[in-house]
Structures are given as structure tokens and as C-alpha cells.
Regions:
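Catalytic core of carbohydrate-active enzymes
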Residues: 1-154
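Surface-exposed interaction regions enriched in Ser/Thr/Asp/Glu
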Residues: 176-191
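Solvent-exposed beta-strand/loop surfaces of large extracellular or lumenal domains
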Residues: 51-69, 160-179
Length: 191
């Protein structure tokens, strides 16, 4: 958990943001602090995806919304590869087992990396995602069998993949690839 100014030292607004914070380097959190449930938050420059709804917003400005105590503004920064676990009722489990890798708004020519750790914090797998045109390549230093990769914010007529089964949803703007073979690299192509 870090103040906004640590992640965005060149953004003059970030120095004055006391009611929101960064969770790691990719998640922006703006807690509900008012009884009327209204939250005003600032998104720095770039594209930000609402973690819960998938709505994409442009940064460099303030937003306001009404939330209850079971929701809050939680945004994922563009060019982020975020791992989520399959178990949500306990903190100590094999995080890699059944995990989903969420790839948010990866720009053409960009790369991003995600480290997966065990319950003691030791690295078990590091995955790098790269985009070249309509081809997304994910490479890992360990076997990726059993993982799911979800691409957020895509528009494509067709999606194909090597070493994975594909499901594309044009309504949500997401495509997912379930890795069902022992491999350390997959390529997902958007058409």
C-alpha cells in the first residue's frame, strides 16, 4: 500500500491525494469514507479499467461515483498483467493452482511482467506478456499448464491461440485462453 505520489511523482495532483492509494504498482484503490457513499477519486494519465465492471476510463481527471460498503473504486492500470487466485475463502493455498492471469490494455510494443509466489513469498513462476500488433505472447519460467489468461479491453473478429483453448466474448470485450498443455509459451492472435 503506497501513497499516490510514490507511483506518480511527476503528477502534481498526486501529492494531494490523501483518500486513495496504490496497492502495488497497478491497482488504484479509493475507499468509501463518507456516510452518503459518494467517492471522488483521481485517475492519473493513462487508461484505467474498473476491476469489477470492466469499464475503461481515461485518466488525468477526477471522477465521482456512489458506492456501498461492499464495493469501491478499484482500478487496474493499463499494461498490467495481474494474477488472481482460484480460492477466495482462505489465504493459504497454492496460488498458482487454477490461477487466472488478467492482461489489461497492453499497448502495441509494450511488455509487462507478473510474479507468482507461494504462501511464503518465494517465486514459483514469472510470466512476461508482450504485444506486437495483434499477437500477444506470454512466456513463463515454469510450466503454465492449468492457468487461464484473460485479455481485457479487446475488439477482434476472431481469436486464435497456440497451446490453449479460446473463448471470446464480444459483449464484455474480453477473450480468455485456458492453457491445457505443458508449455512455457503461448501466442494469442487477434484478427
Amino acid at each position: 500500500m503506497r501513497p499516490m505520489v510514490f507511483e506518480y511523482p511527476c503528477d502534481p495532483v498526486a501529492a494531494y491525494l490523501e483518500t486513495q492509494y496504490m496497492l502495488g504498482d497497478a491497482l488504484l484503490v479509493a475507499p468509501v469514507l463518507r456516510e452518503d457513499k459518494k467517492v471522488q477519486y483521481y485517475l492519473p494519465e493513462g487508461r484505467w479499467t474498473d476491476y469489477f465492471t470492466g469499464e475503461v476510463k481515461t485518466g488525468g481527471r477526477y471522477y465521482e461515483g456512489e458506492y456501498d460498503y461492499f464495493s469501491l473504486p478499484l482500478y487496474v492500470k493499463e499494461n498490467t498483467l495481474l494474477a488472481t487466485g482460484a480460492v477466495n475463502d482462505r489465504p493459504d493455498y497454492d496460488y498458482r493452482d487454477g490461477a487466472t492471469l488478467h492482461l489489461y490494455e497492453l499497448a502495441d510494443g509494450a511488455t509487462c511482467t507478473c510474479r507468482m509466489v507461494d504462501v511464503k513469498g518465494a517465486d514459483v513462476c514469472t510470466i512476461t506478456a508482450e504485444r506486437r500488433g495483434g499477437v500477444y505472447t506470454l512466456k513463463a519460467d515454469a510450466d503454465m499448464n492449468g492457468l487461464t489468461v484473460m485479455l481485457h479491453g479487446i475488439c477482434a473478429e476472431g481469436v486464435t491461440a497456440e497451446n490453449a483453448r479460446i473463448h471470446a466474448d464480444s459483449v464484455s470485450g474480453c477473450a480468455s485462453a485456458v492453457i491445457s498443455t505443458s508449455t512455457r509459451e503461448i501466442k494469442i492472435t487477434l484478427e
